[in-house]
From Swiss-Prot:
Lipid-bearing positions (S-palmitoyl cysteine): 347
Protein name per Swiss-Prot or TrEMBL: Bombesin receptor subtype-3
Glycosites: 10, 18, 29
Gene Ontology CC, one term: neuronal cell body
Record function comment: Role in sperm cell division, maturation, or function. This receptor mediates its action by association with G proteins that activate a phosphatidylinositol-calcium second messenger system.
Length: 399
């Protein structure tokens, strides 16, 4: 008869624990504390594949998000309302990639939680803050795109950038508030296998023996960080679709071309935000479902099998990968960002094309000419400068 091993209650990223080593012991058939040796345990090839995958996620994610942030701060034309939110999203992804992903990678070789009680609280707080920033930012972005599509010709106020920065800061504060209980109640708990007389330390948001708390925690995480925000986003995008379906351009002929371009630009950005939302939903769904499954079908012991381990690794990797795919989705969807991304990636400054007259600020437009002087053949130069506080064509929605 095969020996039954304990199964840690949390085998998902949503509760950042050292449960992978206990789940690895669940797929092992040996009696050693590590849980990595035995007929059913992952071999060196599997470990190498796991660490290569994590290394790719971390390096590619840091590179992509760092370039996105650099493009935003170095390129004046990219400092627009939607790009402020997207840059805030990149900061949240970088935070996760620099802290939680490397910590999670240590679980596959370590026997217990390595970072102590303080590390447990801090990392739990960072992890949930990053997830909150991502989903709440996407929700606000969807609301912003709905307003832009419904009122495509409305000029933004002069303080729009400042107000958007304040909104982005508010999202971070709200995410931290939601993550605060996680930091307060997270602790290092002992998980024991009576058959092997071995104990493991696990960073959890609740005592391992409290099944009801586990069920409540998994449901709250699923609702607050997935179902509710995505439901709000779905409502906004259904309204956007209805508006676009019913819309007719009842505008004067001389303004037709400019209005169409502005509307098409805002529709294109709405599509970009929708792709980012879809990527978030796809990457995080397996993680949430797996956490719910383990919370409501908890068993103290599980038969040794590679399947739980593989499914757990897949859900973690997919969730982490969401933090590195956004810059490349923007590269695919936005020619403007693609140009700046290539310039930064190749370490050279892209040549800036001569801006067309329609994009030239009127407060910087100078007209020069030569006219003959009165009563003589002498030719004089004249220079006329136009002063205005607006531009001929706005770029507030460039992505």
């Amino acid at each position: 008869m095969s020996q039954r091993q304990p199964q840690s209650p949390n085998q998902t990223l949503i509760s950042i624990t050292n449960d992978t080593e206990t789940s690895s012991s669940a797929v092992s058939n040996d009696t050693t504390p590590k849980g990595w040796t035995g007929d059913n345990s992952p071999g060196i090839e599997a470990l190498c594949a796991i660490y290569i995958t994590y290394a790719v996620i971390i390096s590619v994610g840091i590179l992509g998000n760092a370039i996105l942030i650099k493009v935003f701060f170095k390129t004046k034309s990219m400092q627009t309302v939607p790009n402020i939110f997207i840059t805030s999203l990149a900061f949240g992804d970088l935070l996760l990639l620099l802290t939680c992903v490397p910590v999670d990678a240590t679980h596959y070789l370590a026997e217990g939680w390595l970072f102590g009680k303080v590390g447990c609280k801090v990392l739990s707080f960072i992890r949930l803050t990053s997830v909150g920033v991502s989903v709440f930012t996407l929700t606000i972005l969807s609301a912003d795109r709905y307003k832009a599509v419904v009122k495509p010709l409305e000029r933004q106020p002069s303080n729009a950038i400042l107000k958007t920065c304040a909104k982005a800061g508010g999202i971070w504060i709200m995410a931290m508030i939601f993550a605060l209980p996680e930091a307060i109640f997270s602790n290092v708990y002992t998980f024991q296998d009576p058959n092997r007389n071995v104990t493991f330390e696990s960073c959890n948001s609740y005592p391992i023996s409290e099944r009801l708390l586990q069920e409540i925690h998994s449901l709250l995480c699923f609702l607050v960080f997935y179902i509710i925000p995505l439901s709000i986003i779905s409502v906004y995008y259904s309204l956007i679709a209805r508006t676009l379906y019913k819309s007719t351009l009842n505008i004067p002929t001389e303004e037709q071309s400019h209005a169409r371009k502005q509307i098409e630009s805002r529709k294109r950005i709405a599509k970009t935000v929708l792709v980012l939302v879809a990527l978030f939903a796809l990457c995080w769904l397996p993680n949430h479902l797996l956490y719910l499954y383990h919370s409501f079908t908890y068993e103290s012991y599980a038969e040794p099998s590679d399947v739980p381990f593989v499914v757990t690794i897949f859900s973690r990797v997919l969730a982490f990968s969401n933090s590195c795919v956004n810059p490349f989705a923007l590269y695919w969807l936005s020619k403007t960002f693609q140009k700046h991304f290539k310039a930064q990636l190749c370490c050279f400054k892209a040549e800036q094309p001569e801006p067309p007259l329609g994009d030239t600020p009127l407060n910087n437009l100078t007209v020069m000419g030569r006219v003959p002087a009165t009563g003589s053949a002498h030719v004089s130069e004249i220079s006329v400068t136009l002063f205005s506080g607006s531009t001929a064509k706005k770029g507030e929605d460039k992505v």
